[in-house]
C-alpha cells in the first residue's frame, strides 16, 4: 500500500514524507518537543495483496468467491499502513465497500450498513484495542447462523448443515472456557467458514476463520475449534509484546484443547499431555521455547511444549492455578504482557518457589526435554 498524503493534527505541518522498506518516514516543518501527543492522518491506496514472508504469503488473499485476511504475524501492511508489532494495540474503524451480494464480516460492532446502487458500504468499529495482526476482513456470499446467545457463524448457504453440526458445541465451549478463565472478553464470538479449504484455521479479534475442510461433519477438528476460541483470552484480549513469547499464546490454546477434551469425557488433560510428551520425545530437542527464533516460532514443538509447561505449572499449583490465572486475565484484559508477569503470579501462589523456578526454567529455557510432570 502506498501513502498518498500525510497530515498532522496538534503538531507542526508535515513538510515531507518518504516510504521505503516497510517504513514511513516523516519530516515536520518544525521540531516537535519530546512527549508531545498528536494525531496523524495517512491517506493511502493500492491493491491489497499477500506479503511474502519467512512463513509464506500472508495478509490479504483472494478466495474462490471473495477475499479474506489472515495476517499473523506480519501481514497487516498488505492492506493498511501500520506499526505492525503485536504490542501496538489501537481502536479501529474498518469501512469496506463491496459489490452486492457480497457480505463483509470484520472486527467489532457493525455500526452501519449502507446500500448504494450495486454496492454496500459496511462500517465496523472495535470497542477494545486490537493488535494489527488481529484486524481482519472476510468478504463472501455468506449466510448467517446463530450458534447460541453470543455466538454466530457466517458461511455459504450450501454449507449450513455441516456448519451447524460441526459448531453445535460452540456456545458450550464459550461457557466452559468462561468458567475457567473468566468472562468472555468481547461482546460476541463469530466464526467465518470460507468455501476455500484453508490449511489451518486462524484467530482474529472476536472471530475465527475456518476453511471448508474443517467442517466435515464428524467433529474431527473439534480441538481446533476449541483452540481458536481460547485465543480470545490468550493472545487477543491479553496480547504479547514480542513474538518470541508466542508460547504463552499457543501453549494455553493447546492446553485448552486438552481441557475441553477432558470436559467432554474423551480423555483427561493429563493423558493428553502424556500422549503429546511421548511424541515430543521422538523429535529433535534443538529449540528454546522461550525464544525459538522467527523460523521456528510456529513449530509444533513450541505449541506442545508450551502446553506441557502450562500442565507442569498446573500440577505444581493445584487449585490455585485457575484462581491465579483468572486474576491475571482480569488484571491485564485488553492490554499487552510479558510472560514474567504471569509467571511471577504463579510463583507467588506456588507451594515451593524454588521447585517452580526449576520447573519453568527446564521447560522454557533449556533445549532438553524435561521429565514428564507428575
Language-model features: locations:
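A surface-exposed beta-strand-loop module
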Residues: 1-61
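Hydrophobic helix-coil surface modules that form long, contiguous segments used
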Residues: 82-226, 255
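Amphipathic alpha-helical substructures
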Residues: 299-374
Amino acid at each position: 500500500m502506498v501513502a498518498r498524503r500525510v497530515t498532522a493534527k496538534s503538531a507542526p505541518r508535515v513538510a515531507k514524507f518518504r516510504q521505503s522498506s516497510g517504513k514511513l518516514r516523516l519530516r515536520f516543518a518544525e521540531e516537535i518537543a519530546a512527549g508531545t501527543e498528536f494525531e496523524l492522518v495517512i491517506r493511502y491506496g493500492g491493491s491489497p495483496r499477500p506479503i511474502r514472508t519467512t512463513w509464506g504469503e500472508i495478509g490479504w488473499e483472494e478466495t474462490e468467491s471473495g477475499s479474506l485476511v489472515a495476517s499473523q504475524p506480519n501481514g497487516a501492511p498488505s492492506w493498511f499502513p501500520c506499526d505492525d508489532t503485536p504490542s501496538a494495540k489501537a481502536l479501529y474503524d474498518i469501512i469496506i465497500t463491496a459489490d452486492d451480494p457480497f457480505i463483509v464480516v470484520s472486527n467489532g460492532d457493525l455500526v452501519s450498513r449502507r446500500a448504494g446502487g450495486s454496492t454496500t458500504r459496511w462500517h465496523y468499529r472495535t470497542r477494545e484495542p486490537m493488535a494489527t495482526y488481529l484486524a481482519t476482513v472476510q468478504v463472501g456470499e455468506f449466510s448467517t447462523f446463530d450458534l447460541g446467545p453470543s455466538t454466530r457463524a457466517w458461511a455459504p448457504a450450501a454449507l449450513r448443515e455441516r456448519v451447524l453440526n460441526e459448531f453445535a458445541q460452540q456456545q458450550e465451549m464459550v461457557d466452559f472456557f468462561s468458567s475457567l478463565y473468566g468472562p468472555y472478553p468481547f461482546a460476541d464470538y463469530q466464526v467465518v467458514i470460507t468455501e476455500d479449504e484453508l490449511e489451518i484455521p486462524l484467530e482474529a479479534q472476536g472471530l475465527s476463520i475456518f476453511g471448508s475442510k474443517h467442517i466435515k461433519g464428524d467433529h474431527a477438528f473439534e480441538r481446533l475449534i476449541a483452540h481458536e476460541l481460547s485465543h480470545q483470552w490468550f493472545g487477543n484480549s491479553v496480547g504479547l509484546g514480542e513474538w518470541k513469547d508466542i508460547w504463552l499464546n499457543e501453549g494455553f490454546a493447546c492446553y485448552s484443547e486438552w481441557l475441553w477434551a477432558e470436559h467432554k469425557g474423551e480423555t483427561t488433560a493429563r493423558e493428553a499431555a502424556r500422549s503429546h510428551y511421548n511424541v515430543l520425545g521422538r523429535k529433535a530437542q534443538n529449540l528454546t521455547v522461550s525464544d525459538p527464533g522467527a523460523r521456528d516460532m510456529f513449530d509444533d514443538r513450541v505449541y506442545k511444549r508450551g502446553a506441557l509447561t502450562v500442565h507442569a505449572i498446573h500440577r505444581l499449583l493445584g487449585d490455585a492455578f485457575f484462581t491465579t490465572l483468572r486474576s491475571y486475565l482480569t488484571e491485564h484484559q485488553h492490554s499487552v504482557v510479558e510472560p514474567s508477569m504471569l509467571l511471577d503470579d504463579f510463583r507467588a501462589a506456588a507451594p515451593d518457589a524454588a521447585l517452580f523456578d526449576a520447573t519453568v526454567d527446564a521447560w522454557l529455557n533449556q533445549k532438553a526435554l524435561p521429565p514428564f510432570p507428575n
